[in-house]
Design a protein with these regions (language model features):
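Intrinsically disordered, low-complexity boundary segments flanking structured domains
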Residues: 27-29, 59-64, 139-144
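Short, conserved sequence motifs used for protein processing/export or organelle targeting and
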Residues: 75-291
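Bacterial Sec-dependent N-terminal signal peptides
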Residues: 1-4, 9-43, 51, 291
Length: 291
């Protein structure tokens, strides 16, 4: 999976570099967003043809209402059964393809949809046996994890073509860690099955759009408290959008190429650090994409 993502990223992401312990300042309109407390990523594996999936989305919203910015959500549309677009003969219903190559790769690796949707992962904890969680299991795990002391702090800032991620080590630690940078989009109005209803104007939020990088946080496995690692990522939103369209049209099963019409005004950057052995997400942060 990582090899495939790395190949795609090398085409669409112009540059990605890291500088250790450098006091840099990005020229950006957006103020940096940083995480000093433990934050949690809830990955909601879903599909617009999944009639029970809106209940999971509402559960995620309820958890976020309680814990506010400590909870970051990501809706990952997966599987031919639940996320394929309908044929053109059934237009206008369910014509959009929310799937991405990264979401499909994650689903293949973690096997979430094979357990039935809706289902999700909370910081990818419990892998490889107990990570595929029903929505009613999310809240209790969140409550247990939020009080943990974080080992990393993430700061995100962006311009129209550059994303800057600063990772600060809060506690000296050894391990094999990766840094991931994703783009998500809110307020996508489109079809969704919700119980017995086909809702034409359902609001889809924090939908995974793209993954810019998934690569080693550092060349070293030893991290020292106070150390900072800065990653600069140039991106081309138009090229990333076209990649999704091409994936839907040429690769995704039953795809139709209707995967564009991104609205950059509604997009966010989600970045996280995960343990490459256990797959557990150690820290996550989110910031609006400055466009």
């Amino acid at each position: 999976m990582k090899k495939y993502i790395s190949i795609i990223s090398s085409i669409l992401v112009i540059t990605s570099c890291d500088v250790v312990e450098g006091p840099y300042m990005s020229d950006t309109t957006n103020p940096p967003i940083n995480s000093t407390t433990k934050k949690i990523l809830i990955e909601d594996f879903t599909g617009h043809l999944c009639s029970n999936c809106p209940d999971a989305a509402r559960e995620l919203t309820a958890i976020k209402d309680i814990y506010q910015d400590q909870i970051i959500g990501m809706a990952i549309h997966v599987s031919t059964s639940f996320a394929r677009p309908y044929s053109a003969s059934q237009a206008p219903a369910f014509q959009y393809d929310f799937r991405t190559q990264w979401g499909d790769n994650w689903d293949d690796f973690y096997g979430v949809s094979e357990a039935g949707l809706p289902r999700g992962m909370v910081n990818r904890m419990g892998y490889p046996e107990n990570h595929k969680l029903g929505k009613d299991e999310w809240a209790s795990i969140v409550a247990n994890v939020l009080n943990q002391e974080p080992d990393f702090e993430l700061t995100i800032s962006s311009t129209t073509d550059l994303i800057t991620i600063n990772s600060e080590i809060l506690n000296s630690i050894n391990g094999d860690y990766n840094l991931v940078v994703c783009l998500t989009e809110d307020n996508i109005i489109n079809w969704q099955k919700d119980g017995a209803n086909n809702v034409e104007d359902y609001e889809h939020n924090h939908v995974l759009r793209s993954v810019l990088i998934d690569e080693a946080l550092s060349s070293s496995s030893s991290y020292i408290s106070g150390q900072e690692i800065e990653r600069l990522i140039n991106y081309d939103l138009t090229a990333l959008e076209q990649s999704n369209i091409n994936y839907s049209e040429n690769t995704a099963e039953a795809g139709n190429g209707n995967a564009g019409n991104w609205n950059s005004e509604n997009m966010s950057i989600v970045s996280y650090i995960y343990n490459n052995i256990t797959k557990e997400i150690m820290q996550v942060e989110e910031a609006h994409l400055n466009n």
